[in-house]
Every structure is written in C-alpha cells, then in structure tokens.
Swiss-Prot record:
Component of the heterodimeric YscE-YscG chaperone. The YscE-YscG chaperone forms a stable ternary complex with YscF/SctF. YscE interacts with YscG, but makes very little direct contact with YscF. Homodimer in solution. This is Type 3 secretion system chaperone YscE. GO terms for cellular component: cytoplasm. Chaperone of the type III secretion system (T3SS), also called injectisome, which is used to inject bacterial effector proteins into eukaryotic host cells. Along with YscG, prevents premature polymerization of the YscF/SctF needle protein within the cytoplasm. Is also required for stable expression of cytosolic YscF and for YscF secretion. Likely plays a role in targeting YscF present in the cytosolic YscEFG complex to the T3SS apparatus. Required for Yop secretion. It comes from Yersinia pestis. Belongs to the YscE family. It comes from the Bacteria. Disruption phenotype: Deletion mutant has no detectable level of YopN secretion, YscF expression or YscEFG assembly, but it expresses normal levels of another Ysc component, YscJ/SctJ. Deletion mutant fails to secrete YopE at 37 degrees Celsius in the presence or absence of calcium. Keywords: Cytoplasm, Plasmid, Virulence. It is found in: Cytoplasm.
C-alpha cells in the first residue's frame, strides 16, 4: 500500500482533503459565473474537471469513507 493509500484510510484525512477540494471547486465555479473571456473560461473548465476527478479518485481509493 502506498503512503497516499494509507493516508486515505484515515477518515479525518479524507474529509480534510475532500473539503479543501470542494472549497476550491466552489470558488472556481463562482469565478466562472462572474464571467471572463473564452480562453479563461476554458481554463476554468479544465480546472473544474480536474478538481471533480480528484474528488472522485479520493472517494474511490478511500472506499468512500466520509
């Protein structure tokens, strides 16, 4: 088991990481709603997908320990 997998079996660690990612995603979505040019919007979309993927991976690896 990798160190990351070991950490993700700690419920508090999973909650903390997930909360940080969700807060970043919320901020990003607020920025998207404020608007910007097409290039910036594309960057925000990629960042949003990356954050959503990270959350999904953590839940998968951690066995969804919330």
């Amino acid at each position: 088991m990798t160190q990351l997998e070991e950490q993700l079996h700690n419920v508090e660690t999973v909650r903390s990481i997930t909360m940080q990612l969700e807060m970043a995603l919320t901020k990003l979505k607020k920025d998207m709603m404020r608007g910007g040019d097409a290039k910036q919007y594309q960057v925000w979309q990629r960042e949003s997908k990356a954050l959503e993927s990270a959350i999904a991976i953590i839940h998968y690896v951690a066995g969804d320990l919330k």
